[in-house]
Amino acid sequence: GFSEPYEGFDLDPPELEIEDPSAVDPVDSRAVTDLLDDRNVAGDEVDVDQLLDVGVEYMAINRHEQAAEAFERAARYAEDDTLEAEAWVNKGIAHGELEEWDAAVSAHREALHVDEEGEYAALAHTNLAYALWERGEDESAFQHAEDAVRDDQRLPQGWYNLGFIQVERGQHEDALECLDNAIRLGFQESSVYEEKARALEGLDRNEEAAEVRETAQEMQEAEEERLIESE
């Protein structure tokens, strides 16, 4: 297992950037929407985009239970398959942050059921892979990780997650190719270089691995400094 929920994998929902998360309280800023009484509001009166925004804001301030509720509500009212799939994917990610793997699996499968070949299919597959991996379903996780990059070859976190699983499975040559793809597509975090070092070590390319691991260490230190500065 992993010591932290997202160690190894990268499964961030899209567009979770808020300049000052501590200053945002979705309950205050979206009170009418968030306190919606489902029994008294017709579906065509619900702003699904706004509900998605509520969930994203909750995610940004680590209120994942509230985020999951907002995303579920958005999914229930969405009349567009793409919006509904987005809501289910984000709900699954929120459950993943809470380490609620069964709920995460269900949400991502629902996203694929709604729109199996749509815009969010690759994200659903790669997030489903993570949740299944955490449940110990290694083979299913690997299959969905492959499906993610098959659906969207330009999804950097999809390549990273597949590479991570391949390192764990001892498929070091394939893993190296996936991790290099992730880097080329802009995935610039210490974790991808750490996994690349592991893949190189598995291929007995130890000198290269040491150089890559040094890069990973430098990036990790920079990430930690940015985290401290943001607090």
Regions found by a protein language model. Give the residues of each.
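Structural marker of alpha-solenoid helical repeat scaffolds
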Residues: 77-80, 114-117, 151, 185, ...
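TPR-adjacent "capping" and linker segments in tetratricopeptide-repeat scaffold/adaptor proteins
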Residues: 32-50, 78-81, 115-119
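Canonical positions in the second alpha-helix
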Residues: 74, 110-111, 147-148, 181-182, ...
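Conserved alpha-helical positions within TPR/SEL1-like repeat arrays
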Residues: 52-60, 85-97, 120-133, 157-164, ...
